[in-house]
Amino acid sequence: MMESISFQVDDGHGMSRDEFISRWLVVGTESKASGLSTAKEDRNGLKVRPKLGQKGIGRLSSANLGPLCLIISKRKKCDFVVSLIDWRLFENPFLNLSDILIPVEEVQSLEQILPVAENLRIELLRNVTGHPDNDAELNTDRPELIARRERISTAWKQFDSVSESEGKSKPSSAIIDMLTELPFAPHHLSEWQVWKGESECGTALLVSGLNFDLQAQVDATQSDISAMASRTRFFETLSSFVDTYSDNFQSSSLTADPDFSYAVRVWENDSLLPKLILGSGNEFNAAKLSNIEHVIDGIFDAEGVFRGHIRAFGRDLDEECIIYPPDDLSMPVRDDGKVGPFGLYIGALEFDPKNTSLSDAEFEYFKGLAERYAGFLVFRDGLRILPYGRTDNDFFEIDERRSRNAGREFWNHRQMFGRVAISRQRNPNLKDKAGREGFLDNRAAKV
């Protein structure tokens, strides 16, 4: 069976060699914390976008897709940067971090990318075998090179021994087997805008050894429970990735349309025509909720006061609704706990058809939407924050409260659509967990 490859491509401003090493590859730099906006010449005509995520998210996300990653990046007026990484090198606890050498090269043309990747393969393999580049290095008596080779050899012997004692295969053998021959080919880059000559800049990541969740998307014929659950979770994770409530909603006045499009496609058995799994062009649009029977749409200010529009059983209240926070809620006043203003939209329908104000056709329409897209999401600056909105997440305790008192609690993830819209500028205390999904469990998140 042919090796499945995942490729992620974009037409962003790309990275030079120095930027790739200092901003993406090296751990613990200040690139995300500097607060500097992207230079105008790098925005490709787009508006200024806030920086998203935390330092290290890119590396962790790449490693989660699969162990072997070929990275190609092109910045305007710069050469192509090409690097090859096997993330399993960093799983060896006996290996010194300083002994791991990630090969990085620059090339001037597209045609040179895959040939130079072969050289990178040989260099990367040395992190496991310890073999020198050439006979001259093999015969050298430089103590530091000899010591490094010995440390690498010893580290993998120790790691292999531990794995075998646990009944597992040798980690070194798995890496060597994958690096025997690179599975990447020119057609894997055929959809990249830079490869097609449609853009002067961008980045491409080619990943091999796909994790189970991605493999389940490639082979849609898998019908076992695990594969089906993976496909469902994948859809829940990436559908509605961009805030579709950005137009004509009162709750959107604090955030801007990110002007961001995406798509996930699968080419089966090297077919010429891909199958669209999901994408911003064919996903749920909040405009479809214009006639839903219950609506809350407005803004919470920094004092916790809600001002907005209410609809109940299909009837819009004429006056603006103002709701003050409960008496037992005290808003934080310390700078590290303050919550800024944010937008809230909720659209919902009745569970029981006999209670609805909708027609039979409308009720069935919204019921069908709910089966596929219901949930309460969180967006920052127009892009979704995970895991909020997935069926396995109840951050706002909506389902928990209903399970305790179904007669009193109306809201339920299965029959509501909605989102909280925040911005990094107005809510800097709502911070992402490093390397994990969701907000840090601090005072601001609890409010």
Task: Map each language-model feature to its residues.
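GHKL (Bergerat-fold) ATPase N-terminal catalytic module, capturing the glycine-rich phosphate-binding loop
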Residues: 1-209, 215-217
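Beta-sheet entry/capping signal
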Residues: 5, 59, 68-70, 202-204, ...
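Short secondary-structure boundary/capping segments
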Residues: 24, 85-88, 220-224, 280-282, ...
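Short alpha-helical segments and helix-capping/turn motifs at coil-helix boundaries
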Residues: 54-57, 187-192, 247, 360-364, ...
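Solvent-exposed loop and beta-edge segments used for protein-protein assembly and interaction
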Residues: 63-65, 197-201, 256-258, 338, ...
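Extended, regular secondary-structure scaffolds
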Residues: 205-347, 352
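Charged regulatory segments coupled to nucleotide-binding catalytic modules in large multidomain enzymes
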Residues: 214-216, 229-230, 297-447
